[in-house]
Amino acid sequence: KLALWEPPYFLDPDARPPADQVQQYETMIAEGRRGDAAEYFMTKVVGMPPEFVADARTQPWWAGQEAIAHTLAYDARIMGDYLVPTETVAKVKVPTLVLAGGADMPFMRDTAQAIADALPEGEVRFLDGQGHNVDATVLAPALKEFFE
């Protein structure tokens, strides 16, 4: 069995991140602008409001975002065009649970549903009240139920 939490794809081709994002990340990292790279990801890729990111930069956890900012280019390369890879997904032959937060951005729930629909043995579950940073005490029971 397999479980996925909020697969980071898009259904709408117009919602995809900028095509030059790998170059943008690499330039920012080379220039020592790790925070800018993290901000670029949050605003240009995920679509978070700039005011959220401005506040995020003041939070204690922001240093962690900067520390891993160099990996954003790796992620962008792996993701390709960021559209749901339905042909690849359809080849997964194990029972798969696709989870998303019920309080998260709508595109995450839509994507989770689309992936579950494309899987031969897929099911989707939305965890009420949860955002992207899911509470482990909410996630664990859903996973336990599925894997038993």
List where the protein language model places each region.
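Flexible "cap/lid" loop of the alpha/beta hydrolase fold
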Residues: 1-29
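Solenoid-repeat scaffolds in large eukaryotic assemblies
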Residues: 34-40
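Hydrophobic, aromatic-rich cap/lid helix
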Residues: 60-84
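Serine-hydrolase catalytic core
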Residues: 84-93, 116
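Conserved alpha/beta-hydrolase "acid-adjacent" motif
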Residues: 105-111
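Catalytic active-site module of serine/aspartate enzymes centered on a nucleophile-bearing elbow/loop
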Residues: 120-148
